[in-house]
C-alpha cells in the first residue's frame, strides 16, 4: 500500500502546471550584442578593420559576427553553419589554421577563433601568427597604464609559460598561478581582488 501512495505522489509531482517552464527570449541575442558593444570605449573604432572570425559552428555563430559588424568592422565569418554535429569540427580555436589561412588570403587586419561554447579564444595577427592565451594576456598587460590596485597582478595557471611569467614581472605586475581551468582562475582573481587572468 505504501508503494501505491508513493507512486501516486510522484505522479502528482509531475503534473504539468507544477513543472518549470522553458521560455525562448528572441531578443536575448540583441540584448547581449548591445551589452558587448557597451564595453568598448567610445574612442576605440573598428571602422576600416577587416576581421576573419571563426565561430566553430557553435554558440556564438550569430552574435559574434553581429557584434563586430555593428562596431563597424568588415567581418569575414567562417564556422557559422552549425548542424548539431559539427561544433568544433576542424574549426575554431582548436583548429586555428583555417583562420590563419583566411587572414592571409583576405589580407585581414587580424583573426579571431572561438571555441564552440565561446569561452576560449585565440587571435591571429595580420601575418597569420597565432596568439594564444599567454600572448593575449601580455598584450593586455602591456597596454594597461594602470598597474595598481585591482590591476597590480595577473593570474595564470600551471600551464602558463615561464617566459610569460618573467615578462609580466618585468612590466611590474605580481603573478600567481591557479590550477588549470577557468573556474580556478576566476576564484583566484576574486581572492586576490585582481582583474586580469586567463589560461
Please state what every model-predicted region is.
Residues 1-4:
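Short, exposed "boundary/linker" segments that immediately precede the start
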Residues 8-12, 16-34, 126-198:
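Proline/glycine-rich low-complexity loops and linkers
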Residues 8-12, 16-104:
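Gly/Ser/Thr-enriched, mixed-charge loops and adjacent short helices
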Residues 57, 116-120, 128:
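Short, glycine/acidic-enriched loop or turn micro-motifs at the edges of active sites
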Residues 106-110:
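Accessory "access/gating" subregions that flank catalytic or transport cores
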Amino acid at each position: 500500500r505504501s508503494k501505491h501512495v508513493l507512486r501516486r505522489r510522484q505522479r502528482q509531482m509531475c503534473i504539468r502546471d507544477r513543472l518549470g517552464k522553458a521560455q525562448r527570449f528572441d531578443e536575448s541575442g540583441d540584448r547581449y550584442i548591445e551589452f558587448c558593444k557597451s564595453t568598448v570605449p567610445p574612442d576605440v573604432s573598428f571602422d576600416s578593420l577587416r576581421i576573419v572570425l571563426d565561430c566553430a559552428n557553435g554558440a556564438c555563430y550569430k552574435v559574434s559576427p553581429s557584434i563586430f559588424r555593428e562596431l563597424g568592422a568588415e567581418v569575414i565569418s567562417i564556422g557559422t553553419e552549425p548542424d548539431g554535429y559539427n561544433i568544433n569540427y576542424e574549426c575554431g580555436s582548436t583548429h586555428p589554421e583555417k583562420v590563419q589561412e583566411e587572414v592571409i588570403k583576405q589580407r585581414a587586419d587580424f583573426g579571431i577563433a572561438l571555441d564552440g561554447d565561446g569561452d576560449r579564444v585565440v587571435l591571429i595577427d595580420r601575418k597569420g601568427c597565432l596568439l594564444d592565451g599567454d600572448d593575449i594576456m601580455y598584450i593586455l598587460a602591456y597596454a594597461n597604464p594602470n598597474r595598481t590596485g585591482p590591476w597590480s597582478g595577473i593570474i595564470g595557471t600551471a600551464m602558463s609559460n615561464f617566459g610569460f611569467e618573467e615578462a609580466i614581472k618585468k612590466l611590474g605586475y605580481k603573478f600567481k598561478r591557479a590550477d588549470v581551468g577557468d573556474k580556478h582562475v576566476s576564484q583566484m582573481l576574486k581572492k586576490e581582488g585582481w582583474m586580469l587572468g586567463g589560461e
